């Protein structure tokens, strides 16, 4: 009984603490037509301190989305265009000699921002990708002999173009695993497309004004960590991830020869974190199975390795996650 009272109190507190989410979503909706899944993914990454890898063709509002979010939170935004000639110093910063001061000074790179858009991350060599991914992991960078902490909150949204694969440097599996979510962005619907045309040829873009602060986001993160996850939900998360490793144990023998490797414990951790953030966005103090299912594809699609047999049969990690979710027993 005491637990029920605790959850009720937590629900009330989370409803109060998550009020700003409504303002953020309505602010995003004023600027971005459709792309609700992209907006939700950005909020999940922001509230659970995770980074996002986006895959979609150019022109689907990826840049506009993260820029608008940074403006709504009154924080710093930067965009890094990854190219084959980019150097790690172009991302994290370097030491430059000042003739006036007659000494070397630190010039901080574009990674020193709250929201960083790493555009076409697979266009730059591995050493540049590693520089950014290390900064994402450590939340700090070393320039010369000095170490600098990155701003807080710090959210990286990296993009990849799924069509153009020539002259690219695919991210290694170990690096991709550092992204909490991999989100596939689709085209807008017909009605959304008409609205986009109308808004872009008839008027100016809506003016974006801050609706919350970075400090409020940091407070919200601590509340998200209090969202209740029942032991049965923990078991459900563990079962889903285990089914990516040992599908035959869950009545999915046909998937055994399709998966070369499954999700690591990082997948379980991120699935729980993302489900908590999703519950918070829905203004609930506890996680339900639907929250786990809602984020499972984005958390797992880049953490499942496919065999040659799967690729030859045109089976995707997307389909594998769907089969697992439909088969694993829901509490």
Residue spans for each PLM region:
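Walker A/P-loop
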Residues: 46-83
């Amino acid at each position: 009984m005491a637990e029920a009272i605790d959850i009720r109190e937590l629900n009330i507190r989370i409803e109060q603490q998550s009020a700003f989410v409504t303002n953020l979503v309505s602010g995003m909706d004023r600027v971005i037509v459709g792309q609700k899944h992209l907006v939700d993914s950005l909020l999940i990454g922001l509230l659970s301190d995770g980074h996002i890898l986006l895959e979609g063709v150019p022109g689907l509002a990826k840049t506009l989305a993260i820029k608008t979010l940074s403006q709504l939170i009154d924080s710093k935004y930067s965009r890094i265009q990854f190219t084959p000639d980019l150097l790690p110093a172009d991302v994290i910063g370097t030491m430059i000699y000042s003739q006036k001061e007659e000494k070397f000074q630190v010039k901080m790179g574009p990674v020193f921002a709250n929201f960083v858009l790493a555009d076409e991350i697979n266009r730059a060599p591995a050493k540049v990708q590693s520089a950014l991914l290390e900064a994402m992991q450590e939340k700090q960078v070393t320039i010369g002999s000095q170490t600098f902490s990155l701003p807080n909150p710090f959210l990286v949204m990296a993009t990849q173009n799924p069509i153009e694969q020539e002259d690219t440097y695919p991210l290694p599996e170990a690096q991709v695993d550092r992204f909490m979510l991999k989100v596939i962005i689709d085209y807008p619907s017909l009605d959304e497309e008409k609205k986009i045309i109308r808004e872009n040829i008839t008027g100016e873009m809506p003016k974006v004004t801050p609706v919350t602060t970075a400090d409020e986001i940091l407070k919200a993160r601590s509340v998200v960590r209090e969202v209740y996850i029942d032991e049965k939900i923990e078991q459900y998360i563990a079962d889903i991830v285990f089914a990516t490793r040992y599908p035959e144990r869950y009545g999915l023998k046909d998937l055994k020869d399709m998966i070369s490797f499954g999700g690591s414990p990082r997948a379980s951790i991120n699935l729980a974190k993302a489900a908590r953030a999703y519950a918070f966005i829905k203004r609930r103090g506890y996680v339900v199975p639907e929250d786990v299912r809602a984020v499972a594809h984005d958390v797992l699609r880049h953490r499942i390795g496919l065999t040659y047999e799967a690729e030859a049969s045109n089976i995707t990690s997307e389909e594998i996650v769907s089969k697992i979710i439909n088969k694993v027993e829901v509490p």
